[in-house]
Amino acid sequence: MLLTLGFGAGAQKIVHLNRYAEANAALPPANGPRVVLYGDSITDGWPRQRPEFFASTGFIGRGISGEETAQMLLRFRADVIDIGATVMVFLGGINDIAQNMGDPYVEDVTYANILSMIDLCWQNGIRPVICGLLPSYYIRWRTEVTDSFEKVCSLNARLKAYCERHGVTYIDYGRVLAGPDGKILKDYSGDTVHPNAAGYERMEKLLLDSLK
């Protein structure tokens, strides 16, 4: 099922509710903790670049390239709750800053969408783990957004503060991906948004340490 969002006039207003329908239906019953990585293209591309990580951990990837947080919120039940997740690791928001749906970026809206997903986790006995946005500083498909790094830092600061107040695990991938200026190093991302295999490998270690 494709759901068209009925607000704004942007280019990408589709929620791909059936993207993972077959994969979800094929999942065996969970016989232990079920960790779902949830997000956008960064999560979507992770299993392709580092399939051995998912094979060794049993983690489930449910990312969709290009999605904003509003789209992720709409498919949250199908791709997190209904597949029996016990832990949800969220990484998203850069496409909100990139205005992928064509609407102006409003930090309060993105922040509220993420908090709504945290609330859904708590209501369904799922442990939420929130990842800060990667410290991107150039969005190649939206070059007119010249302050992406500042917007990333601002949203991350709010998410980190919320997590600290409410006892939610917060993962700062910038710790292992950024240089002295706080921006992602080209050693770990060719376009400053999406990690390469080396970047994912560094993220994996921090993720596993954070889930202990």
Predicted regions and their residues:
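Serine-esterase "nucleophile elbow" of acetyl-processing enzymes
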Residues: G8-V89
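Charged helix-capping and loop-helix junction motifs
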Residues: Y105-L115, F149-L155
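Amphipathic, non-transmembrane alpha-helical secondary structure
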Residues: A70-I81, D108-L115, D119, E201, ...
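Catalytic His-Asp segment of secreted/periplasmic serine-dependent ester chemistry enzymes
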Residues: L3, L134-K212
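Active-site flanking residues adjacent to catalytic metal/cofactor-binding acidic residues
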Residues: Y38-D40, G92, C131, I171
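Active-site segments of SGNH/GDSL-like serine hydrolases
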Residues: L91-I97, I118-V152
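Metal-dependent catalytic neighborhoods of phosphoester/phosphodiester hydrolases
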Residues: Q49, N100-V106, L133, W141
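Cell-envelope and extracellular/periplasmic
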Residues: R62-S65, G92-G93, I97, M101-G102
